[in-house]
Structure formats: structure tokens, C-alpha cells
């Protein structure tokens, strides 16, 4: 829900004969609760979900569920499209799962989750402080302890989630992941996006995508993060 950015593209896709399913994932909203059941992911957070509690790697379960749904409905030529963090999840899913049911994909404005870049950015000291706080909570046996951070985005995070997204491992660095994507992929970026997390993509996105089979890059003039 609340996928207004997709309304106009969806209408054009429908007009071109492509069916569209607008969906969400476990990272929607800040915090919400789910019955735990037998889910390992829900047991980990005691049923709490949302952006404050999510682990990005779990996006594989969400993409698999929606792709399974589409296949069960009879679709065989499936494309997926994610925006912002959803774009990071799209690239990560394609790079790590290699699901042959997905014929093509679009990733719009994926922020770069690069630990060193966050330390070196203008607000690097704020990031360093939040990261130290998350590490302290984790070391104290409180991975679900909450912290309010302003870098790279103003939000509430559990220590586990903050370390997962922005840790030294750079697990979700979209630029690091791109060479592992085998699916034809279009990456887009708004020409008016000025956040430091998009600087390297704006600078080298065209070259990087040209080196990938089926890769393409589009810098949209005059577009902000929500196009």
C-alpha cells in the first residue's frame, strides 16, 4: 500500500499489456506485530516487524512469496521493481538468489550501504556515535534495544538491524553486489538526488551497468527521490 510512486508507471504498463501487482514487504511501517508461529525470523524479534526490526536478508522470503503467488496465478514472464530500500532488496535478491523465474528487474534509487562512506560523509561523526551505541547494545546482550539515529536516515532501529544494514561487512552495498546480478536489470536515479549515498551511483552507474549483460542505467533529469 501507499505505493503512489508506482501509480503512473503501473498505468502505462497496464496500457502496454503488462499486468501489475503492487506489493509490500516485512519492512513496511516502523513497527508492527505478527503472530510468531513457527517462523524463525519472527521468533528472533518476538513477533515485532517493520523497518526498525527487519533484517534485509529476509527480503528473500518476501520476494519468493510474491513470485510464488504470481507463478501460481499462471504468470511465467515476471519482472520485479523496487524503490529506495526496496531497490537495495531487489539487487540483493537478484545477486544472491538467481531466481530464473524473474526475467527482468528495475531498481530505482538504491542507496549505497557502505560503512566507510558513512563514516567519511559530512555527518560521519553522528553515524560513528550511533554505530557505537548499536555495538554497545549488542555487546550487552540487548540486540533488540532501540536507538534513534539520524544517519544515514532519521529513524528508529534495533541494534541488530542497524548493525546488519550499515556494518563493516557492507553486506548490502548495491555497487558491490551488481556484478553478481545475472538478470537483465535497469537501475534508475533521480537527477536531483543529492544525498551522499547516491553520489557514487550518479558518478559511475552508467559505466557499471554497461559492463553487465542486460544492464542499463538511467539518470532521470529533474527527478527527486520519489520521481
Model-predicted regions and their roles:
Residues 80-82, 108:
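Short beta-strand immediately N-terminal to the catalytic nucleophile in serine-hydrolase-like folds
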Residues 8, 92-96:
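Active-site signature of alpha/beta-hydrolase-fold catalytic machinery across serine-
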Residues 82-86, 90:
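Gly/Ala-rich beta-loop-alpha elbow adjacent to hydrolase catalytic centers
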Residues 38-73:
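Alpha/beta-hydrolase active-site loop
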Residues 19, 76, 184:
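Residue-level detector of anion-binding/catalytic polar loops
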Residues 1-38:
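Short, surface-exposed "cap/lid" segments of acyl-processing enzymes
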Residues 51-58, 100-220, 224-227:
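The alpha/beta-hydrolase serine catalytic core
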